[in-house]
Amino acid sequence: MDWQNRFSVLNLSSHDPLPELMLTHLTGWGAITLVGTDKKAYLQGQVTCNVVSLQEQQVTFGAHCDAKGKVWSVFRLFHHHDGYAMFQPQSAMEVELRELKKYAIFSKVTIAESSDIALGVMGSQADAWIDTVSETTGDVRRIAGGTAVRMSPQRWLLLVNAEQAEQYVNAWQGLHVEQSLWTRMDIEEAVPVVTQTAQNEHIPQALNVQAVDGISFTKGCYTGQETVARAKYRGINKRAMYIVKGNLSAPLSQDEPVVLERAVGENWRSAGALLTYYRFTDSIAIGLIVLPNDLEHDVELRLAAQPDTRWHIQPLPYSLSEE
């Protein structure tokens, strides 16, 4: 069997525990790489995070904005091979690559889409498994064929060449699962996300990038910095990203935006589209959405296409306060 066909859907209800060890092929994600003598200085002038202070064993969130502070991409940045990798949703990469390259002609830097394979290791035994394939500690580790990166306490990314990916998949002793479980964990961890449909719509703080330490307010200038700084120091940001959960009366559309409405008195008003979502087998779904940050947390929501459904805001795993 071709290794890429070994991953199957794992049907879970909203009450089922997650298996202890799972591997998935992250075809919906990819990485942009930067190599060359000017890679650090160039990227430092483009993104919200501090590239200069990023150590070999560290990973950081970051965002890349236009001049008005609207986000092209939210990514995880880490050292990979002889340069940097920016891990992000595949659908955002075409536009992000174009925008990131815009001023690169003046610098000694090569920016490209990585040909490496992205695999995701998930579950309570993920750390123990990573220890068997790496000889170092830390959140970013060099491994055979590439790099292992800790995404969260029970998740690791493997960004490796195709030959090594095949070896890992074929030797895997846990479950081979389809990538939607990675999306589920992103949602439960409220990982900031920008796919193609949400590019150039929000400033970083509306996606909670500051709450996951993806914005440095002490670094030098970068594209969109003025808006990002004003949002912090003048309080102009009125939006935040939230986890929402609710019931379904029919499958969600794969092709159209999944729009939520919020109750306003006895009426309903559009609240926006889900950035991403995951559906359980018991007609429950969870998602991420950008909403006004002064909304009452007990506000009633519903799917615009399924008005008999009810959705609610869930607690975030981190604080949005600026303290």
Swiss-Prot record:
Keywords: Cytoplasm, Folate-binding, tRNA processing
Annotated folate binding sites: W29, W182
Keyword NADP: no
Any one Pfam family match given in the protein's UniProt record, by short name: YgfZ_barrel
Keyword presence, Cytoplasm: yes
Transmembrane segments: none
Compartment list: Cytoplasm
SUPFAM superfamilies named among the record's database cross-references: Aminomethyltransferase beta-barrel domain (SSF101790), Folate-binding domain (SSF103025)
Main location: cytoplasm
Molecular function (Gene Ontology), one example: folic acid binding
Any one GO BP annotation for this protein: iron-sulfur cluster assembly
GO cellular component: cytoplasm
Function: Folate-binding protein involved in regulating the level of ATP-DnaA and in the modification of some tRNAs. It is probably a key factor in regulatory networks that act via tRNA modification, such as initiation of chromosomal replication.
PANTHER family linked: TRANSFERASE CAF17, MITOCHONDRIAL-RELATED
Homology family: Belongs to the tRNA-modifying YgfZ family.
Name listed for the protein in its UniProt record: tRNA-modifying protein YgfZ
